[in-house]
């Protein structure tokens, strides 16, 4: 009898817990939704109480910031709560607001919310990864018996050793069968929708003026949340593209994540961002980098092509991976000013462009709008199907009236990608969180000609017409920089460069009386798997402060793995000069800094 009572109480408890679950578990494979619309059907992000708890509040300079936690839901009988910063301008008004979602390895930031409050926005910055936010506050995100985080390195209560990307069940998943609800992205999208609910319930927020933005993983969360009809605009950063399970044309090994999923069909129709963009009704500003590993360039346009409305823009920082510049960051302010606050920053439309092919030549034209504010129009092209490591060649364009045009040769069994970046003047400089800018950049449509058969080996057969690797005649147009000092390029991946391993780097330097050190870094990351040799470095203290030439053999580069560098397998090449007297890096993005390096060549050196 006693055993019966225990059994009965246990079952009643399980029934009670099951009844309070945010999602009833799917019992069979047949119960599992097969598309994104069905997956979210019936879920109401407002249904459950948020149970908001204010942990701490700061009030300073007309800005209020609160450290809060609120309930995401109940999963496997345990409550999941997320911590966040809620910031708003203390102006007595109902402000436009948006949710910010940080990227992988990152955390919510109090100063980010403070900055956007100075711009007139209320924000909730969700700390989905669970990293510490304040040194004196232990209360934080607690996912309970589920875990969509990145393992114990970041989240002290992690239930798994690392990142769960597949849809298969385990002891910490919602469903006991393969299901999209077992993917970490699903739980993060639930938390994102709950954050929208939190924001719309705040008395300082105008619930009809809500947006969503996020960086990297936060960009993917943005994409999976953008179908929420409460949102009036979204702006994903370096994340949020679809088709992540597919390899690039030419079957670039490792470029797709399909190997992680046992059921790629279920993934592609329920969790991949391509399953969501067709149902996004609000305006989209996609902000990224030309060589981004996470939001691959071509996939951005493939994703935007799924939208059923034309109200979208793309802006990418050139020759950069995972690093938007000030000309991109400012567009978050401009986009939300226009679509959330009802201001009119007059963001031009996507620059109209055309593309045609005839007699072995492709013709590309672009006719940007708002040319009274237009400062520059740059056209870029590439034959490389690997958008993570391709070098975007700057094309010499002809201007006729209001239109720029270029002609580019087409090669058999090689794709061709071409687009334009248009730089505009802002009405006045805008102070960003960390920098200031007086300009912004918008991309045209990317036009792609992809043959039925893509043979990447044909890239090495193209004519070798590039004699000078760099002479800075056009400044750092072909380079990028994170710190405005070291400069990095993908130029080793341009097919017009002779990358024979018998060649050497010839670097002409003019220290102009300074005691300098030269540092070179080369990396193969994000090339196809078979070509990824790892990272290499070279360091040399210049023995003279007079003009000189330095020869660098590929064997001179050091590898922590003991490998030998191959010129054709250099994806990124970084140059740094250090003033040995001050131990400070020379600012190579400046004209003065570039004057120290007269030229860089990759060529065969006789008598060596």
Task: Name the predicted role of every residue range.
Residues 83-86, 94-103, 123:
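Short beta-strand element of the alpha/beta-hydrolase
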Residues 338-381, 393-407, 458-464, 501:
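Surface beta-strand/loop "capping" patches
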Residues 465-470, 479-563, 569, 576-607:
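Extracellular ligand-binding interfaces
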Residues 307-323:
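Catalytic histidine neighborhood in serine/cysteine hydrolases
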Residues 42-92:
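N-terminal cap/lid segment of alpha/beta-hydrolase-fold proteins
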Residues 114-189, 241-253:
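Cap/lid segment of the alpha/beta-hydrolase catalytic domain
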Residues 280, 286-288:
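Short beta-strand/loop motif that positions the catalytic acidic residue
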Residues 194-257:
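Primarily recognizes the serine-hydrolase "nucleophile elbow" in alpha/beta-hydrolase
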């Amino acid at each position: 009898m006693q055993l019966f009572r225990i059994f009965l109480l246990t079952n009643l408890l399980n029934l009670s817990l099951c009844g309070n679950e945010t999602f009833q578990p799917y019992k069979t494979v047949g119960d599992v939704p097969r598309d994104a619309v069905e997956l979210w059907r019936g879920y109401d992000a407002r249904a459950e109480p948020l149970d908001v708890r204010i942990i701490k509040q700061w009030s300073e300079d007309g800005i209020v910031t609160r450290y809060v936690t609120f309930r995401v839901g109940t999963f496997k009988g345990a409550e999941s709560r997320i911590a966040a910063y809620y910031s708003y301008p203390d102006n007595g008004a109902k402000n436009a607001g948006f949710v910010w979602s940080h990227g992988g390895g990152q955390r919510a930031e109090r100063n980010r919310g403070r900055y956007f409050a100075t711009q007139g926005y209320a924000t909730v910055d969700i700390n989905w990864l669970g990293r510490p936010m304040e040194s004196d506050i232990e209360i934080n995100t607690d996912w309970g018996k589920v875990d969509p985080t990145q393992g114990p390195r970041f989240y002290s209560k992690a239930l798994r050793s690392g990142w769960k990307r597949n849809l298969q069940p385990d002891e910490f998943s919602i469903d006991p069968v393969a299901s999209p609800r077992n993917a970490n992205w699903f739980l993060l999208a639930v938390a994102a929708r709950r954050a929208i609910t939190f924001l719309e319930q705040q008395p300082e927020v105008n619930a009809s003026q809500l947006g969503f933005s996020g960086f990297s993983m936060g960009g993917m969360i943005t994409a999976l949340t953008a179908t929420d009809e409460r949102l009036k605009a979204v702006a994903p950063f370096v994340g949020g593209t679809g088709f992540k399970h597919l390899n690039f044309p030419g079957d670039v090994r490792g470029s797709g994540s399909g190997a992680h999923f046992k059921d790629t069909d279920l993934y592609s129709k329920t969790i991949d961002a391509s399953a969501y963009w067709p149902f996004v009704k609000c305006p989209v500003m996609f902000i990224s980098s030309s060589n981004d590993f996470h939001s691959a360039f071509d996939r951005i346009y493939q994703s935007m092509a799924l939208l059923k409305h034309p109200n979208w823009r793309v802006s990418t920082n050139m020759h950069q991976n995972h690093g938007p510049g000030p000309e991109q960051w400012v567009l978050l302010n401009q986009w939300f000013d226009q679509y959330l606050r009802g201001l009119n920053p007059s963001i031009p439309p996507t620059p109209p462009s055309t593309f045609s092919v005839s007699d072995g030549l492709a013709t590309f034209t672009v006719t940007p709008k708002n040319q009274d504010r237009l400062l520059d129009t740059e056209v870029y092209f590439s034959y490389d199907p690997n958008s993570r490591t391709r070098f975007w060649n700057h094309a010499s364009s002809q201007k006729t009236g209001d239109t720029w045009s270029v002609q580019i040769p087409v090669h058999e069994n090689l794709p061709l990608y071409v687009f334009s970046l248009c730089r505009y003047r802002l009405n006045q400089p805008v102070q960003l969180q960390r920098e200031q800018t007086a300009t912004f950049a918008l991309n045209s449509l990317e036009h792609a000609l992809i043959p039925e058969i893509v043979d990447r080996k044909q890239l090495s057969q193209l004519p070798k017409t590039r004699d000078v690797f760099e002479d800075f005649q056009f400044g750092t147009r072909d380079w990028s920089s994170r710190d405005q000092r070291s400069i990095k390029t993908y130029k080793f991946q341009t097919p017009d460069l002779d990358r024979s391993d018998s060649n050497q780097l010839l670097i002409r330097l003019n220290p102009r009386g300074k005691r300098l050190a030269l540092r070179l870094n080369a990396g193969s990351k994000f090339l196809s798997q078979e070509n990824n040799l790892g990272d290499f470095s070279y360091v040399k203290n210049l023995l003279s402060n007079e003009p000189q030439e330095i020869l660098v053999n590929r064997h001179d580069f050091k590898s922590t793995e003991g490998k030998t560098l191959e010129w054709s397998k250099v994806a990124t090449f970084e140059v740094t000069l250090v003033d040995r007297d001050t131990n400070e890096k020379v600012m190579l993005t400046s004209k003065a800094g570039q004057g120290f390096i007269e030229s860089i060549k990759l060529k065969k050196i006789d008598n060596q």
